[in-house]
């Protein structure tokens, strides 16, 4: 109401939110508090929730949105999406104002969203048409966030390649994607860069390349027939994932070049998604080095080029001609092409030296000479895994990973773009069962504490944290069977949202302390 009555004050409020949306904590000072809360973190620390366009928006036939890779993947192979699709998803497209009120209820500062490429360019390229209705939707969404005091963090690409580009030249298998992605990124930076200062070019490039083009678990489902479960699928494991990542990295560099010309005062990064690893046998001299080796293959694969300008040396040594080479000009563009390290952390496991891989059946996991083990040499599991949990819970690994990045990459600014707990409920489970998510509450408590220790004790420069996810949503090959939301979505009854116990905890946690939007500019 105040914004409507006093338009000048409203404008100043929006400007304040935009200006204060690029926040750095160079020398974190951690207050002493009686219990862990927002007040336990440095001034200016940003807390939020996250989603992705394909997973929540729905409305696939509105705004002239073109088909995306996952639309076709799930329709052609419904069994590979658990029989589900994202045609409606959780209907965020129509309910975003309602959902922004849920964000406000949580006391969050920020919201991470993604833009659907084919909602802007239905056919993948500007010359083939721009959907002005799609452009307007994201303007309206961003404006509504700002009006409610919530800082938008925007991901340019979250796995939803326009199907037209996939059909035309194979999407990210072709270097043609580099110029098309640059054009798309240029358009969204120009369109929204005056309002949005925090950007991610690519979400989880390791998962996108490995799961989509090496083991075939995610779209487009490509893998070699010698891999278990890939008998009837096209692809070339051990080759295509490296090519896809190479094109993705060059596309990132081109987009960042445009970004730094167009978005003044902004920050940009990539959201990486490594697990943490502990040696299978601490007394085995072959197992101990597997931690750094597998992290080079999982994290360094994309973080080394954007930091140092080239792939990790171990990848070059082990892959040989199968790893594409950057030109000198590409290296120059890639080096220092991120302003912060985006990190998505979920789980940890054990790493074991794999001494004798079969050279006739290459794959990403085999290439690193590392086997992943659920238990160590003493038959102990890593962390805990409740019965409904999708992944083991190991908060210590979160802190260890943060310290690893600090030490290896010269203490960069880090933003936790995703952290969350998935539980696989049964169809018969009631809303009451779904909202009593005490395991998720415990997960958040442990990981927020681990992050606080990394900041305050290890002096890691973490400046923001986003819970995955605001809402239960479409979880790729798991469909709607794997729930990560702070809010329960009743898929059987009008997609009604219900507050979970974890949401109540996060709201209480964030209710204690000063929000960044309430700080003076010189305090940020």
UniProtKB/Swiss-Prot annotation:
Where do the catalytic residues lie?
A: 204 (proton donor), 418 (nucleophile)
Q: What induces it?
A: Up-regulated by salt, 2,4-D and methyl jasmonate. Down-regulated by cold and mannitol.
Protein name (Swiss-Prot/TrEMBL):
Beta-glucosidase 22
Kindly list the cysteine pairs connected by disulfide bridges.
223-230
Q: Which family does it belong to?
A: Belongs to the glycosyl hydrolase 1 family.
Binding annotation for a beta-D-glucoside: 55, 158, 203-204, 346, 418, 468, 475-476, 484
User: Which leading EC class covers this enzyme?
Assistant: hydrolase
EC numbers: 3.2.1.21
Question: Which positions make up the signal peptide?
Answer: 1-24
Which stretch carries the motif Prevents secretion from ER? 521-524
Q: Which UniProt keywords apply?
A: Disulfide bond, Endoplasmic reticulum, Glycoprotein, Glycosidase, Hydrolase, Signal
Q: Annotated Gene Ontology MF terms?
A: beta-glucosidase activity
Subunit structure, as described in the record: Component of the PYK10 complex, at least composed of PYK10/BGLU23, BGLU21, BGLU22, JAL22, JAL23, PBP1/JAL30, PBP2/JAL31, JAL32, JAL33, JAL34, JAL35, GLL22 and GLL23.
Spell out the activity regulation. Answer: Activated upon binding to PBP1 or PBP2.
- Catalytic reaction annotation: Hydrolysis of terminal, non-reducing beta-D-glucosyl residues with release of beta-D-glucose
Query: Is Glycoprotein included in the keywords of this UniProt record?
Result: yes
């Amino acid at each position: 109401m105040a914004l409507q009555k006093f338009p000048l004050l409203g404008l100043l409020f929006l400007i304040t939110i935009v200006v204060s949306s690029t926040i750095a904590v160079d020398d974190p000072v951690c207050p002493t508090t009686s219990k862990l809360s927002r007040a336990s973190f440095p001034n200016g620390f940003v807390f939020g929730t996250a989603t992705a366009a394909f997973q929540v928006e729905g409305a696939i036939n509105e705004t002239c949105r073109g088909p995306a890779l996952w639309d076709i993947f799930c329709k052609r192979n419904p069994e590979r999406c658990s029989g589900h699709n994202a045609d409606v998803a959780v209907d965020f497209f129509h309910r975003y104002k309602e959902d922004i009120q849920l964000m406000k209820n949580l006391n969050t500062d920020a919201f991470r969203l993604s833009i659907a490429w084919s909602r802007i360019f239905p056919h993948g390229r500007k010359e083939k048409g721009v959907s002005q209705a799609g452009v307007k939707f994201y303007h309206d969404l961003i404006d509504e966030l700002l009006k409610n005091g919530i800082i938008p963090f925007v991901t340019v690409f979250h796995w939803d390649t326009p199907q037209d580009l996939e059909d035309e030249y194979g999407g990210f298998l072709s270097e043609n994607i580099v110029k098309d992605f640059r054009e798309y990124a240029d358009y969204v930076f120009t369109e929204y860069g005056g309002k949005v200062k925090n950007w991610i070019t690519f979400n989880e490039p390791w998962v996108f390349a490995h799961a989509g083009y090496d083991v075939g678990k995610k779209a487009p489902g490509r893998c070699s027939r010698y891999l278990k479960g890939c008998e009837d699928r096209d692809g070339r494991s051990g080759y295509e994932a490296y090519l896809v990542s190479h094109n993705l990295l060059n596309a990132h560099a081109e987009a960042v070049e445009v970004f730094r010309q167009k978005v003044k005062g902004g920050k940009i990064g990539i959201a990486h998604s490594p697990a943490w690893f502990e040696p299978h046998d601490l007394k085995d001299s072959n197992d101990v080095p597997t931690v750094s080796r597998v992290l080079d293959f999982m994290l360094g694969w994309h973080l080394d080029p954007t930091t140092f300008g080239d792939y990790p040396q171990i990848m070059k040594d082990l892959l040989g001609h199968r790893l594409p080479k950057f030109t000198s000009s590409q290296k120059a563009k890639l080096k220092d092409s991120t302003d912060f390290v985006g990190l998505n952390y979920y789980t940890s496991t054990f790493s074991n030296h794999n001494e004798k891989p079969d050279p006739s059946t290459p794959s990403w996991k085999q290439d690193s000479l590392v086997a992943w083990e659920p238990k160590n040499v003493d038959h102990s599991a890593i962390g805990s895994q409740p019965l409904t949990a999708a992944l083991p819970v190991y908060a210590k690994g979160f802190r260890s990973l943060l310290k690893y990045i600090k030490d290896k990459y010269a203490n960069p600014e880090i933003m936790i773009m995703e952290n969350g707990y998935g539980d696989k409920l049964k169809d018969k489970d009631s809303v009451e069962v779904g909202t009593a998510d005490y395991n998720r509450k415990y997960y958040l408590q442990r990981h927020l504490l681990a992050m606080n220790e990394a900041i305050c004790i290890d002096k890691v420069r973490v400046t923001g944290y986003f819970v995955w996810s605001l809402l239960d949503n479409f979880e790729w090959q798991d469909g709607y069977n794997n729930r990560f939301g702070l809010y329960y979505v009743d898929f059987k009854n009008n997609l009604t949202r219900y507050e979970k116990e974890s949401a109540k905890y996060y709201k209480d946690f964030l209710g204690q302390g000063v929000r960044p939007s309430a700080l003076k500019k010189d305090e940020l």
